[in-house]
Design a protein with these regions (language model features):
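Non-cytosolic head/periplasmic domains of membrane-anchored proteins
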Residues: 1-100
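A short beta-strand motif characteristic of beta-propeller blades
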Residues: 1-2, 29-36, 73-79, 120-128, ...
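Repeated scaffold domains used in trafficking and secretory/extracellular systems
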Residues: 2-11, 39-50, 82-92, 128-142, ...
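Residue position within the beta-strands of beta-propeller blades
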Residues: 15, 54-55, 98-100, 145, ...
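Short proline/glycine-enriched turn/loop motifs at strand-loop junctions of beta-rich domains
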Residues: 18-20, 148, 213, 230, ...
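Structural motif
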Residues: 21-25, 60-66, 105-115, 149-155, ...
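Solenoidal tandem-repeat scaffolds enriched in leucines and small polar residues
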Residues: 61-152
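Intrinsically disordered, low-complexity segments enriched in Gly and acidic/Ser/Thr residues
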Residues: 159-248
Length: 276
């Protein structure tokens, strides 16, 4: 059995196996649909209103992207014969799909974000990215590609704004915030610091702070950012002002922020809902 993975956003979620063909679409009431893909699943990114993008390995192509709605009905299919597509996302308005592509240029690998309108196979924009892409999502109407060197915010016309890590190493990120992204960087600015920051789509820091305690997980949703430290859970706003603190979190290993200000804490054997 391969590695199980989950992508969740806006009250919907997808559970799947990397390298497998089956996925399970969920909403707040439970299972919506069990789906079998035509190829091996590389990645799935859930977006707004239940729309999600699936990157597949298909015979005859390097990779393919399929887009579905919240009922599991197909909206769009794209097949790439020239470039490998690593991950993809659907725009917040449901009109565009962006796929992170990798190709070779002079012996080295380069990454780009290819944007398509869901009514056409014609390439709308091809934006060069800094670094290799780890994750994709949307923030405040823009696509966001999380790379090993920067956060790259890309508009539908291909315009790119970048937040550089300044030599820091990406530890964790959160893209669920409505108007911000969150990053945790280690060895920031060669000072050995752990740096927590919220960032807008212009690539500018909204707020930041130095972190001394170990961070187990972080998650953003709506106006809030949840950071699970080894000794406490802190819920911040986009300005990194503390909204609430929960001290007893010794059994928790993961956190899922919710847009209403509550958070789900998950451990090895149980999960609980924190209501500030």
């Amino acid at each position: 059995m391969g590695q199980a993975a989950v992508s969740a956003e806006d009250g919907f979620g997808v559970v799947y196996e990397i390298g497998g063909k089956d996925l399970y679409l969920l909403d707040g009431k439970g299972l919506v649909r069990q789906m079998t893909m035509e190829g091996e699943i590389f990645s799935v990114e859930m977006g707004q209103s239940g729309r999600f993008a699936v990157v597949l390995k298909k015979n005859g192509y390097k990779t393919a992207v399929s887009v579905y709605n919240g009922k599991g009905e197909p909206l769009y299919d794209f097949h790439s014969a020239q470039k490998y597509l690593m991950t993809a996302a659907v725009s917040e308005n449901g009109k565009y799909m962006a796929a992170a592509a990798m190709s070779q240029d002079g012996g080295s690998f380069v990454s780009s974000l290819q944007i398509y309108k869901l009514t056409s196979d014609a390439l709308r924009a091809d934006a060069a990215l800094t670094g290799g892409v780890y994750e994709m999502g949307t923030v405040n109407g823009a696509f966001c590609a999380v790379t090993d060197k920067a956060l790259c915010f890309v508009k539908n016309d291909g315009t790119v704004s970048t937040y550089d890590y300044r030599g820091g190493s990406l530890s964790r990120c959160g893209l669920g915030g409505g108007k911000f992204a969150a990053v945790l960087l280690e060895n920031y600015s060669s000072g050995g610091l752990t740096h927590l920051a919220t960032v807008n789509t212009a690539g500018e820091e909204i707020a930041s702070l130095s972190v001394e305690n170990e961070v187990l997980d972080l998650s953003a949703a709506g106006r809030y950012l949840a950071v699970l430290y080894s000794n406490k859970l802190v819920i911040y706003d986009r300005n990194l002002q503390e909204c609430s603190v929960l001290e007893d979190v010794s059994s928790a290993r993961r956190v899922l922020m919710r847009s209403d200000g509550s958070a789900v804490l998950a451990g090895t054997n149980a999960a609980s809902l924190y209501l500030p």
